Amino acid sequence: VEEMEGLYGLVQNGAKIQVAEQYHLHPLHAARIAFVQGGKLGRVTQAQLSVCHGYHGMSVLRRLLGIGFEDATICARTFVTPIVKGPGRSGPPVEEEVVETKQEIAWLDFGDRLGVFDFVGDQYFSYFRGQRVCVRGERGEIIDDRARYLTDFKTVVETPFIRHDAGALGNLEGNHHKGYTVGEDWMYRNPLAPGELTDDEIAVGDCLLKMAEYADGGPDFYSLAEACQDRYLDIKMKEAEESGVEVRTTRQVWAG
């Protein structure tokens, strides 16, 4: 935390700094965030995220909840279980091997909103450990790639997040991701189409585009203050895991 305070001092002295964070720019995450911000769920009160680790997870969780720098009470635990080892950065497995894996589960109580963080490191590469997202509001919710919401007190609409990719079923536009729609509305359009890129590569590329815009006088897209806050929440979550007791965050210098 002291190192982040020192780094933020550069901003206080006039430095212009953004941080290269891409997870909230992943196509489906960006589509979910846009849908939440569109208001159809009403006031969002809870988000459950099992997608990515540490500060990456915090960055997505905060956006789904509409949280800025509010303080939280955090309780967290870990749970170790066996799992058949899957692929990794060096490639697929060559034989069956059972290894131990650690699950992190944390409850972040922001008072009027609740964040639930749940992650196992194997989720990045495992053949069977998937991702899960739930966002709950007073008028509806998102569960993974489906939204359900009220248009009035007795009428519910259920609609999927539809992924649009070029190049399948006879389509000759090329092989690339186009975006996501919910109903008739585009929630996300790929800014790097028609590049043939993975979702993570699209997110990193979008981050670079936004960094260039910022350097040219454009708006923040992931400020040092946000990055410090997400890492701070991650640090306090680890503290709660290790101590086994609730931890309370306090307002930091980068929160203004």
Go through each PLM region and give its residues.
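A contiguous active-site-proximal alpha/beta segment in oxidoreductase catalytic domains
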Residues: V1-V60
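C-terminal helix-rich "cap/oligomerization" subdomain common to oxidoreductases
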Residues: G6, Q12, K16, D185-G256
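Soluble or luminal CAZymes and related metallo-dependent hydrolases
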Residues: H24, L28, H53, V98-E100, ...
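Loop/helix-junction capping segments adjacent to catalytic residues or to phosphate/diphosphate-binding pockets
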Residues: H26-P27, Y55, F125-S126, F221, ...
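Rossmann-like dinucleotide-binding domain that binds NAD(P)(H)
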Residues: R43-G130, C134, A225, W254-A255
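Phosphate/oxyanion-binding loops and surfaces in catalytic or ligand/nucleic-acid-binding neighborhoods
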Residues: L64-G68, E141-I142, M237-S243
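NAD(P)-dinucleotide binding in Rossmann-like oxidoreductases
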Residues: D112-G205, S223, T250-W254
